[in-house]
């Protein structure tokens, strides 16, 4: 009985898949718990340790390295797991730093919200000068250009705006 080439390809894929499953099962049975423990000693988080174990297995199956003996295989698997663990630690540090920075920025914005609310209640000329100077970071000469005023007028608006803002904050928020 002759098989079609397509059927033969399916058979080869099934045999290849079964071989990979057997190989994966052998690696998990032999090294799974030890790799999980190693990863956990690095990351101190079972979920991350399980991810590292899974990624180690995937790397093994992708590369399918040939070893001189079982000790070489074990060393390779542990080296990959250790490197993945170190990468995870570095990634987590970066992610935590980014989250902390985002939290600090949000907190800073919340802390200054009441100040900007008070600025909104200032007369328009003071509000414009204060906004452009403090929020946008323009120097007084550039603010004068933007608003079509003399630089001395902008400086006066800033000074008067600060005085008025100080009054508003003292009245509303008991600032001294």
Predicted features and spans:
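A short, charge-rich alpha-helical start-of-domain segment used by transcription regulators
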Residues: 3, 12-37, 50
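Amphipathic, Lys/Arg- and hydrophobic-enriched alpha-helical face
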Residues: 27-46, 63, 119
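Structural recognition of an alpha-helix C-terminal capping motif at a helix-to-coil junction
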Residues: 37, 51-58, 71-83
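Sigma70-family region 2
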Residues: 44, 55-72, 91-92
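Arg/Lys-rich amphipathic alpha helix in sigma70-family domain 2
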Residues: 68, 78-98, 108, 160
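DNA-recognition helix of helix-turn-helix
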Residues: 82, 147-171
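Internal acidic/polar
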Residues: 87, 94-120, 139
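A short pre-motif secondary-structure segment
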Residues: 129-133
């Amino acid at each position: 009985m002759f098989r079609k080439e397509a059927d033969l390809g399916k058979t080869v894929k099934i045999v290849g898949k079964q071989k990979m499953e057997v190989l994966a099962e052998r690696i998990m049975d032999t090294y799974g718990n030890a790799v999980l423990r190693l990863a956990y000693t690095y990351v101190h988080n079972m979920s991350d340790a399980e991810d590292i174990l899974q990624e180690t297995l995937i790397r093994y199956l992708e590369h399918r390295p040939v070893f001189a003996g079982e000790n070489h295989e074990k060393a390779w698997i542990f080296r990959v797991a250790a490197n993945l663990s170190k990468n995870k630690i570095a990634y987590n540090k970066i992610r935590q730093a980014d989250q902390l920075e985002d939290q600090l920025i949000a907190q800073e914005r919340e802390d200054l919200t009441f100040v900007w609310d008070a600025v909104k209640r200032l007369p328009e000329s003071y509000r414009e000068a204060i906004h452009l100077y403090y929020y946008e970071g323009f120097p007084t000469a550039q603010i004068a250009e933007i608003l079509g005023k003399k630089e001395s007028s902008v400086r006066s608006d800033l000074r008067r705006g600060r005085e008025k803002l100080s009054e508003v904050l003292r009245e509303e928020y008991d600032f001294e």
